[in-house]
Regions:
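NAD(P)-dependent short-chain dehydrogenase/reductase
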Residues: 1-24, 30-38
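Tryptophan-centric aromatic hotspots in well-structured domains and transmembrane helices
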Residues: 2, 68, 121-122
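Residues that recognize and position ribonucleotide moieties
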Residues: 16, 25, 64, 87, ...
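Residue-level signal for the nucleotide or nucleotide-sugar donor/cofactor binding architecture
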Residues: 24-27, 66, 106, 117-120
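Mid/C-terminal beta-alpha module of Rossmann-like enzyme folds, strongest
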Residues: 35, 42-97, 137-138
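A hydrophobic C-terminal alpha-helical subdomain
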Residues: 93-114
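Amphipathic terminal alpha-helices
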Residues: 122-138
Length: 138
């Protein structure tokens, strides 16, 4: 998982180059699970024998936008890993057989409007995620 990897790298490496030219939205698995439960609860309440009216494709991710660089900086900041010099770099500096889009932010309008979801920002969910990870260590 990216958070665990960056926690380790920012705690052990003096410098770290991280891609800044690809934007997306980190998604906390717990937030996704809560959204899935809300959809399933809605489905169960609507008596599916009569046909479920809210079909289609729904996108979900946390709110906000960041680059991998921004994400890593925030992880290091929250962890107090201030010794690592995190530097932005271009994605072409990390050759990959997989082509990734420069902008991969999902439109969540449909899922928010259909199910009345209040989706947390990635920065807030990252704090919760890291607190939960820390609690599991104890």
């Amino acid at each position: 998982n990216f958070v665990k990897t960056m926690l380790n790298l920012t705690a052990t490496k003096p410098t770290l180059n991280v891609v800044f030219d690809q934007a997306g939205t980190p998604t906390y698995a717990l937030d996704l699970a809560v959204a899935i439960k809300a959809v399933l609860d809605d489905y169960a309440a609507e008596q599916p024998k009569q046909g479920y009216s809210k079909t289609g494709v729904y996108h979900f991710s946390n709110e906000g936008v960041c680059s991998w660089y921004d994400f890593t900086k925030r992880i290091a900041e929250l962890a107090g890993n201030t010794e690592c010099d995190i530097q932005p770099c271009h994605s072409n500096e990390f050759p990959s057989p997989v082509t990734r889009p420069a902008y991969s932010v999902l439109d969540k309008t449909k899922i928010k409007q259909t199910f009345g979801l209040k989706i947390p920002y990635w920065t807030d969910s990252l704090k919760v995620c890291m607190a939960n990870m820390d609690a599991l260590k104890k």
